[in-house]
Amino acid sequence: MKYILPVLGLLMLISCKEDYTIKPIGQVRLEYPKPVYKPFSSDCHFTFEYSDLAEIRDKENPCWFILHYPEMKANIYLTYFPITDREDLASKIKDSEKFVQEQTVKASYIAPREFVFDEKKVYGTLFELGGESAINLQFHATDSLKNLISGSVYFSTPPQYDSLQPAIQYMKRDVMHLIETLEWK
């Protein structure tokens, strides 16, 4: 009886042979379903396709819309401008690019990508902004005669570029699809 307690204690010490290692902190893994695109049509001078993950919300001005992505807490703000002449077009494009340049305070880089779809008369630039910028993507598209659409992608979360990267890449694909399917009426 007098040896039972020491023997049990010894057995407990010997039985604990598990190696303890520090486990890495888990990272959030953001995965989104493959998008299914549906047509957008209105009384405005354009049509395009957008993801079924987005909801269309009207803004206060006609032909201004918000594509709201509730799952990602993201929005694409679309603004349409009728163009009166070449100077008006140049001024609107300059305003769009000025808006991008104002983000250089927080952006670690700005990568412009021009696109040209002659068959549909869609021309423009997509800007990807890296770092802690308020916007992550900005674009404008025009037919260079009568129509211009400007768009910006915002996330309703603090700008933590690395954490948002999967969502930003998803939104970039959606914006590119919107641009590729954009048609003027």
PLM feature segments, named:
Residues 41-97:
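Secretory pathway targeting signatures of secreted, lumenal, and periplasmic proteins
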Residues 97-150:
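Signature of long, low-cysteine stretches enriched in small and polar/charged residues
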Residues 1-4:
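Positively charged n-region of N-terminal signal peptides that target proteins for export
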Residues 17-23:
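Bacterial lipoprotein signal-peptidase II cleavage site
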Residues 33-38, 63, 119-128:
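Short, hydrophobic/aromatic-rich segments at coil-to-beta transitions
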Residues 24-44:
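Post-signal peptide N-terminal segment of mature Sec-exported envelope proteins
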Residues 12-15:
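C-terminal motif of bacterial Sec signal peptides marking the signal peptidase cleavage site
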Residues 152-185:
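Surface-exposed amphipathic alpha-helical segments
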